[in-house]
Amino acid sequence: MSSRELCTYVGLLGGAVAALFGGWDTALQTLVIFMAIDYITGLVVAGVFHTSPKTKTGTLESRAGWKGLCRKGVSLLVVLVACRLDAIIGSSFIRDATVITFICNETISIIENAGLMGVPIPEALTKAVDVLKQQAEKTE
């Protein structure tokens, strides 16, 4: 297979996936970026700082990492479900609300990971995360 053919297939696949998710807009880009940041900071917390609350020893465990990837994958499947529901009713509200909710969850997790590393968190960001947590608790 030539590099041109490979690029064509990758482009077609990427376009199809983006279409399934309602487009590669800023919200979806932000969610994917935040998911990557959360996963990386989780690896740093466990691998470097050994302070992960996800494992008994606080260190890296492949099972904990795999669970994290599975959760993120299922989160994207939930976004896909929300997008398809929007397609049925002719709106974009459900997808947008779902993506924003997952962005909030990823933000909270990133801030928690930074705190476990001893990174000073600006007060404004801490307050914003507290508000997000309270709103998440109300919807549960």
List the model feature ranges, each with a label:
Residues C7-L12, R71-A82:
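Core segments of transmembrane alpha-helices
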Residues G15-L20, L80, R84:
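Alpha-helical transmembrane segments of multipass membrane proteins
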Residues F21-A27, I89-S91:
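Transmembrane helix interruption/hinge and helix-loop junction motifs
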Residues V45-T57, P120-P122:
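Juxtamembrane helix-loop transition segments at the membrane interface in multi-pass membrane proteins
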Residues S52-S75:
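Juxtamembrane helix-capping/reentrant segments at transmembrane boundaries
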Residues I88-M117:
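Hydrophobic alpha-helical transmembrane segments and immediately flanking/interface helices
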Residues T107-E140:
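Canonical alpha-helical transmembrane segment with a positive-inside/aromatic-interface signature
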